[in-house]
């Protein structure tokens, strides 16, 4: 992902304020509510029958935290996202058979959650930088599919 120095600074500054536990759970939960077909990958998580059930599900929250932990690792290696996400790409492609479009959807949901959580601090410039990052991460996660 090519980010300018200002974009890298903006991403790092905002990310340093992110509560990975909360934002991860909210982002994954919203993905499952807004795009209900993604729930098929999480049938073992139990109750996903309503928005309230999804958003309150401790397994959704725990996995969201794990997902955002991996995303944080990616932020530390923006110049090598394919390498950083190679194992996760292989897992999601070969074993879990996740549609790679879901990575793009989750990235966009994450941007929405960040905007909701940071309000005016999430300026259009910050959003543009994060859109580049989530697109790069989605591409890296989809790498094994090609």
Swiss-Prot record:
Assigned GO CC terms: blood microparticle; haptoglobin-hemoglobin complex; hemoglobin complex
Keyword Transport set for record: yes
Record PTM Phosphoserine, positions in chain: 50
Source organism, top-level taxon: Eukaryota
Tissue expr: Red blood cells.
SUPFAM superfamilies registered for this protein in UniProt: Globin-like
Keyword Heme found: yes
GO molecular function list: haptoglobin binding; heme binding; hemoglobin alpha binding; metal ion binding; organic acid binding; oxygen binding; oxygen carrier activity; peroxidase activity
Limits of the Globin domain: 2-146
Residues where heme b binds: 63, 92
Alphabetical GO biological process terms: hydrogen peroxide catabolic process
Keywords: Heme, Iron, Metal-binding, Oxygen transport, Phosphoprotein, Transport
InterPro entries named in the record: Globin, Globin-like_sf, Globin/Proto, Hemoglobin_b, Hemoglobin_oxygen_transport
UniProt-listed Pfam families: Globin (PF00042)
Family (UniProt): Belongs to the globin family.
PANTHER family linked: HEMOGLOBIN FAMILY MEMBER, HEMOGLOBIN SUBUNIT BETA
Subunit description: Heterotetramer of two delta chains and two alpha chains.
Designated name of the protein: Hemoglobin subunit delta
Species of the source: Saimiri sciureus
């Amino acid at each position: 992902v090519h980010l300018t120095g200002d974009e890298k600074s903006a991403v790092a500054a905002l990310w340093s304020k992110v509560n990975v536990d909360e934002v991860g759970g909210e982002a994954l939960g919203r993905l499952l509510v807004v795009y209900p077909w993604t729930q098929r990958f999480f049938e073992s998580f139990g109750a996903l029958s309503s928005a309230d059930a999804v958003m309150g599900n401790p397994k959704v929250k725990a996995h969201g935290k794990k997902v955002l932990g991996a995303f944080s690792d990616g932020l530390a290696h923006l110049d090598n996202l394919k390498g950083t996400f190679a194992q996760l790409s292989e897992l999601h492609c070969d074993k879990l058979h996740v549609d790679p479009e879901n990575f793009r959807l989750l990235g966009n949901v994450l941007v929405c959650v960040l905007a909701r959580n940071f309000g005016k601090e999430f300026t259009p410039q910050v959003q543009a930088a994060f859109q580049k990052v989530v697109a790069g991460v989605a591409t890296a996660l989809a790498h094994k599919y090609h």
